[in-house]
Amino acid sequence: MAKISKRRQAFAAKVDRQKLYAIDDALALVKECASAKFNESIDVAVQLGIDAKKSDQVVRGSVVLPAGTGKSVRVAVFAQGEKAEQARAAGAEVVGMEDLAEQIKAGQMDFDIVIASPDTMRIVGTLGQILGPRGLMPNPKVGTVTPDVATAVKNAKAGQVQFRVDKAGIIHATIGRASFEPAALRSNLSALIEALQKAKPATSKGVYLRKIALSSTMGVGVRVDQATLAAQ
């Protein structure tokens, strides 16, 4: 732990918390700070100009990152008949109906995302207290309740990330791994920012994207100059 603290302190000394770094410089710093023995995730925190306490200003959605997330995702799908076959063909690891619900109730949840066809919500709806706290409850706002389950599975496998603003008005998301090339991280960040812009509430006033900061799992936050991101 002491070594980690010393390493973190050394990286913190390299980063000016008050400075806005050009996107390329920010990514270089973040990748340099990602020196752990595992392939650290590269995360972004975006401070939004919204009032998260107001229901009409809750920002939520999903986006497929063009360079993927660097993570292998296991998908469970509630579907039957032809849609079940389509889900399996698209690569879903687990497909079912009441049998899948029973597995979940028994605590057997070896998957990272749950997708549901609308006609299965009578079953899925009974699992809210189990799936909800784990962030697994299907929701049409993030594309996980859809009649096109095959596309939803493909998107999940291709690197789709879900986002939802927290109580402080901040969006937290992972845009890749430390092993990614800077260009891949840049394209993923741009895709996320574009999705956030599209999800801007009509009632949001003033500056919408207030602050953007990047960090690695074990690193420190580096603030990004948004003008340089827009110039990419």
From Swiss-Prot:
PROSITE patterns: RIBOSOMAL_L1. It holds the Pfam family Ribosomal_L1. Part of the 50S ribosomal subunit. Keywords: Repressor, Ribonucleoprotein, Ribosomal protein, RNA-binding, rRNA-binding, Translation regulation, tRNA-binding. Coiled coil: none annotated. This is Large ribosomal subunit protein uL1. It comes from the Bacteria. Binds directly to 23S rRNA. The L1 stalk is quite mobile in the ribosome, and is involved in E site tRNA release. Protein L1 is also a translational repressor protein, it controls the translation of the L11 operon by binding to its mRNA. GO terms for cellular component: cytosolic large ribosomal subunit. It comes from Burkholderia multivorans (strain ATCC 17616 / 249). InterPro entries: Ribosom_uL1_bac-type, Ribosomal_uL1, Ribosomal_uL1-like, Ribosomal_uL1/biogenesis, Ribosomal_uL1_3-a/b-sand, Ribosomal_uL1_CS. Gene3D superfamilies: 3.30.190.20, 3.40.50.790. One of its GO terms (molecular function) is tRNA binding. Belongs to the universal ribosomal protein uL1 family. GO terms for biological process: regulation of translation; translation. The gene is rplA.
